[in-house]
Amino acid sequence: MHNLLSRANSLLAFTLWVMAAVTAACFLSTVFLDYTVSNHLEVNDIKIRNVRDYATDDKQADLATLAFNLKVDFSRLFNWNVKQLFVYLVAEYKSAENAVNQVVIWDRIVERAERVVMDEIGVKTKYYFLDDGAHLLKHDNVTFVLRYNVIPNAGYLRLVQSTNQLVVPFPTTYTTTRRS
């Protein structure tokens, strides 16, 4: 009747079809879950320096340094379909040149086996908070937002924003010392 290769091909095709159906069922079982969490964020020790921006032609730029406290519980997000979270803190503000400026100042990968309740105190920025001009000084509406990507085992990569945002006014004078 059928030779060995034909039977192996049929078995492999059926197995792949069943695995695809199970993967789709896994995705559909978690697609409608709510992945938003609330956080408690405090930003303090904000200092702004006017530095030379070597990436542009002899222009000055504002460099902000700050520390923040973050408390958030991600434990309810980890179901069987969540592999890990990519968590990052974004500073958003408007300037004369750009309607929206978004700067990622800190990030962390949170895996299932790690601590999923974050209680960070006095964390410094991981990346430079550099504005391409002098728009940070005296800015009264810099919004800090915690966002995270939910990385699943099966399904699409979900971008989620935390429910709480923090609006912070920036200092009115530059810091002149070299120490942060």
From Swiss-Prot:
A GO biological-process term: protein targeting to ER
Membrane topology, from the record: Single-pass type II membrane protein
A Pfam family the protein falls into: SPC22
Transmembrane parts of this sequence: 13-33
Subcellular location: Endoplasmic reticulum membrane
Glycosylation sites: N141
Keywords: Endoplasmic reticulum, Glycoprotein, Membrane, Signal-anchor, Transmembrane, Transmembrane helix
Chain ranges on the Cytoplasmic side, renumbered to this chain: 1-12
An example Gene Ontology CC term for this record: signal peptidase complex
Chain ranges on the Lumenal side, renumbered to this chain: 34-180
InterPro entries, sorted: SPC3
Quaternary structure note: Component of the signal peptidase complex (SPC) composed of a catalytic subunit sec-11 and three accessory subunits spcs-1, spcs-2 and spcs-3. The complex induces a local thinning of the ER membrane which is used to measure the length of the signal peptide (SP) h-region of protein substrates. This ensures the selectivity of the complex towards h-regions shorter than 18-20 amino acids.
Function noted in UniProt: Essential component of the signal peptidase complex (SPC) which catalyzes the cleavage of N-terminal signal sequences from nascent proteins as they are translocated into the lumen of the endoplasmic reticulum. Essential for the SPC catalytic activity, possibly by stabilizing and positioning the active center of the complex close to the lumenal surface.
Sequence similarity: Belongs to the SPCS3 family.
The name this protein goes by in its record: Signal peptidase complex subunit 3
Organism of origin: Caenorhabditis briggsae
